[in-house]
């Protein structure tokens, strides 16, 4: 599963997920992509589950780009522990997703197969998505 090799600090504040995605909001590498419509968090497990789904559907054809990386640690205190005594240990890693962010990109397969693969992958994610094509400039 994806997680940073090393970080400056082990734990992070919760923060607020506001605004729209301006960076990473266009299909840059492939021909067709999966774009978020709502905001949320995408865990490393969800990124991997969606990637596996796409890989199984396209069967060794084409290329996949994963445009998100889980770089935010989420901590959790053990069950039945009283309040206080410090922040809990890191449980898993997430990526904060803003509306408009491209999550996955595909190339080298038919558009119909790509749409099917991305639709299956979208079912694994906790927010609404849409399929977008690359715009030629």
UniProtKB/Swiss-Prot annotation:
Pfam families recorded: Ribosomal_L16
Keyword tRNA-binding: yes
GO molecular function, one term: structural constituent of ribosome
Gene Ontology cellular-component terms listed: cytosolic large ribosomal subunit
Gene Ontology process terms (BP): translation
Keyword annotations: Ribonucleoprotein, Ribosomal protein, RNA-binding, rRNA-binding, tRNA-binding
Superkingdom assignment: Bacteria
Record-linked NCBIfam families: rplP_bact
Record's subunit section: Part of the 50S ribosomal subunit.
Function as written in the Swiss-Prot or TrEMBL entry: Binds 23S rRNA and is also seen to make contacts with the A and possibly P site tRNAs.
Family: Belongs to the universal ribosomal protein uL16 family.
Protein name as catalogued: Large ribosomal subunit protein uL16
Naturally occurring in which organism (per UniProt): Psychrobacter cryohalolentis (strain ATCC BAA-1226 / DSM 17306 / VKM B-2378 / K5)
Lineage, uppermost ranks: Bacteria, Pseudomonadati, Pseudomonadota, Gammaproteobacteria, Moraxellales
